[in-house]
UniProtKB/Swiss-Prot annotation:
GO terms for biological process: RNA repair; tRNA 3'-terminal CCA addition. It comes from the Bacteria. A single active site specifically recognizes both ATP and CTP and is responsible for their addition. One of its GO terms (molecular function) is magnesium ion binding. Its EC number is 2.7.7.72. Its cofactor is Mg(2+). It catalyses: a tRNA precursor + 2 CTP + ATP = a tRNA with a 3' CCA end + 3 diphosphate; a tRNA with a 3' CCA end + 2 CTP + ATP = a tRNA with a 3' CCACCA end + 3 diphosphate. Keywords: ATP-binding, Magnesium, Metal-binding, Nucleotide-binding, Nucleotidyltransferase, RNA repair, RNA-binding, Transferase, tRNA processing. This is CCA-adding enzyme. Belongs to the tRNA nucleotidyltransferase/poly(A) polymerase family. Bacterial CCA-adding enzyme type 2 subfamily. CTP binds at residues 8, 11, 91, 137, 140. It comes from Pseudomonas putida (strain GB-1). HAMAP family: CCA_bact_type2.
Length: 368
């Protein structure tokens, strides 16, 4: 029974990057032996166990073969006679197919260290093409390691083109696709993810609305550079789409509600935001009301940030509309409802009076 660190922990240590999660591989053990040592089984599809003290995952060495369509169409075989090399060859990239034993010796049968040195994302074997999810994973790794100069190897990009052309990407569930997109959006260079998908034809299959949309990627690049949260990055990515296709994309990928909401509001209101100073007071107040700046001020602030990231992505050095919009929102929020209530107004009459007072406040702000 031999235990190895595998995958990302080995890769990131060799790159000098922080190691967060550690995956462990057990070679030469049976399920019964693992149970006898106190490991707790958690794997539904293949033998994975939790360490009795650390809670970290330990997987038995296994092989796999294609048995159906999509990322889930595999049959696994785990037994004590599966070797380290047989387990590592089923992995996606050479830089993820290294192992390290308890003495610190690195096992690298597929030359992952060479590809780390050459800054290449290269597939381990032709079996790479059997799992369509790997197209998204490789694009995500390209986004993560772009600051270090990594690129996708030509032969791997060609395999990704073949997968995209095969229709296998259509077998991915919305949940799996979104999980990869979500993680990619939060990488250092998220625009690279979509550039790689575009280069291999996968973007046309998964997000045809974004094909050749360089402005969207420029806005996303700015959002990442300014360390914006997920929903802001998503809205930046969809900034150039009309409301109808934004709804289509949101529904197709089952994006989280916060992402859907901000992206759709941006699609509906980006033009007004960009023309904020020219809007009449009534239109400016309608914009504030649409975002419910009184109860949900952060949502309007997020919208302003999306507008700003889009402007910076378009090459503008600043976005003066941002402070103008914030000032208008502050003026409308400053209106005190108490005098209206004390005057005996209720219901619809109160709402209409409050709106009139807010309009006066916005008009005064515009004159200031």
């Amino acid at each position: 029974m031999h235990i190895y660190k595998v995958g990302g922990a080995v890769r990131d240590r060799l790159l000098g990057r922080p190691v967060s999660d550690i995956d462990w591989l057990v070679v030469g053990a049976t399920v019964e032996e693992m149970l006898a040592k106190g490991y707790r089984p958690v794997g539904a599809d293949f033998p994975v166990f939790l360490h009795p003290k650390t809670g970290e995952e330990y997987a038995l060495a296994r092989t796999e073969r294609k048995s159906g369509r999509g990322y889930g169409g595999f049959t696994f075989h785990a037994s004590p006679d599966v070797t380290l090399e047989e387990d590592l060859i089923r992995r996606d990239l050479t830089i993820n197919a290294m192992a390290e034993d308890e003495a610190g010796t690195v096992y690298d049968p597929y030359h992952g260290k060479d590809d780390l040195d050459q800054r290449l994302l290269r597939h381990v074997s032709p079996a790479f093409a059997e799992d369509p999810l790997r197209v998204l994973r490789v694009a995500r790794f390209a986004a993560r390691y772009a600051p270090l100069g990594f690129r996708v190897a030509d032969e791997t990009l060609e395999l990704m083109r073949q997968i995209s052309a095969s229709g296998e990407l259509q077998a991915l569930t919305a949940e799996r696709s979104w999980k990869e997109i979500e993680r990619a959006l939060m990488e250092a260079r998220p625009q690279v993810f979509f550039q790689v998908l575009g280069a291999c034809g996968a973007l046309h299959e998964l997000l045809p609305e974004l094909v050749d949309d360089t402005q969207a990627l420029a806005a996303l690049e700015q959002a990442a550079a300014h360390e914006q949260p997920l929903h802001v990055r998503w809205a930046c990515l969809l900034r150039g789409l009309a409301p109808a296709p934004i709804k289509t994309v949101n529904q197709r990928l089952k994006a989280p509600r916060e992402c859907q909401e901000l992206a759709l509001l941006t699609g509906e209101c980006l033009a007004q935001g960009n023309q904020a100073q020219e809007l009449p007071a009534t239109a400016l107040l309608e914009l504030l009301q649409k975002f419910d700046v009184y109860r949900r001020p952060q949502r309007f602030e997020d919208f302003i940030v999306v507008c700003e990231m889009a402007a910076l992505g378009d090459g503008k050095s600043s976005y003066p509309q941002a402070d103008y919009l914030r000032g208008a929102a502050a003026a409308a929020r400053a209106v005190d409802v108490k005098p209206l209530v004390q005057a005996g107004l209720t219901g619809q009459a109160l709402g209409e009076a409050l709106k009139r007072e807010r309009l006066k406040a916005v008009e005064a702000y515009k004159r200031s």
